[in-house]
Amino acid sequence: MKIKMLLAAAAAVMLTATAAQAAPEKAKLTLGVGGKPLLYYLPLTIAEQKGYFKAEGLDVEINDFGGGAKSLQALVGGSVDAVTGAYEHTIRMQEKGQDIRAVIELGRFPGIVLAVKTEHQGKVKSAADLKGMKIGVTAPGSSTNFFVNYLIAKAGGNYKDVAFIGVGAGAGAVAAMQKGEIDAISNLDPVISKLEMDKTVFVLADSRTEAGTKAIFGGSNPAAVLYLKNDFIEKNPQTTQALVNAFHKALVWLATAKPADVAATVPEAYYLGDKALYMEAVKNSMETYSRTGVISPDGMKSAYNMLAQFDEGLAKANLDLNKTFVDKFVKAVKK
């Protein structure tokens, strides 16, 4: 009897130790994002609405800064613990001496579209023709800004010859174009689909599909990721793993979800007043989400090449792209 009691006690201790080891070091944390309603960041909303964060023992407060550059600034400044943002931010920050790393890929295609006001259709044939125009982006310094910089440089122009205006990622972005406050817009769905439906714009460059992404970049180009300061990752490995687990569950759910399933899960405000249009935008964007959560070496190189096209300092920098992505957490996810 005593032996059985001792064995039972030992087993209980082991279970307790295992549970303690698996528990997140920091259960309550803040996460920044730059335009949460955008389909670019849909995995975040799915993880939140489906309760995947809570299932991993996390209490996540989400702060929407309206643009990716602002959420990055919040991470650097210490006001958020993690960011759902563009992968290229990890590359740019390494050049600046900031060790920020992605831990899971959420989007395998950018999904960004450069569209121009319909009245300019006759004279704008390439991004270089945007010279002297006002271009709306989610926020200056965001991935939507980089996208235009790259396209202009690729077409032989200079991005300094246009004016970038932050218009956000929702109804405000649509209104800015409809009111004539901007001549072109670099944004994502559902904003772009809304403007297309209204025939307010025509599309100049579209990275919502694999074919479109290859036409623009010559190959794959990772988009949204979850990134954190490497110092946080090293000090909070269980918290990081829990975050990755939650986002991976969201990717798995999205892999088989129908547009109606997505519409039933997200807040109604995401529809921009048109549920049918939103579901059509979801349908057009389903191809963009990562299937594995892993960023390939080719994807890293493609993202770097995009930035180097218009950033001379980055082009000359000696960067180690392997330090922009930590793959061990995705590999540790229980499939």
Question: Residues of each region from the PLM?
Answer:
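Secondary-structure end/capping motifs
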Residues: 233-313
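Short, glycine-/small- and polar/acidic-enriched structural segments
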Residues: 23-169, 179, 183-189, 200, ...
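Short, low-complexity disordered leader/linker segments with a strong preference
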Residues: 1-28, 332-335
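Extracytoplasmic/secreted envelope proteins and their assembly/folding machinery
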Residues: 41, 72, 87-90, 127, ...
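Pocket-lining segment of extracytoplasmic ligand-binding domains
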Residues: 172-267
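Short, solvent-exposed loop/beta-turn-alpha elements that line the ligand-binding surface or hinge
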Residues: 55, 122, 208-219, 287-296
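Conserved C-terminal helix/tail region of periplasmic/extracytoplasmic solute-binding proteins
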Residues: 301-335
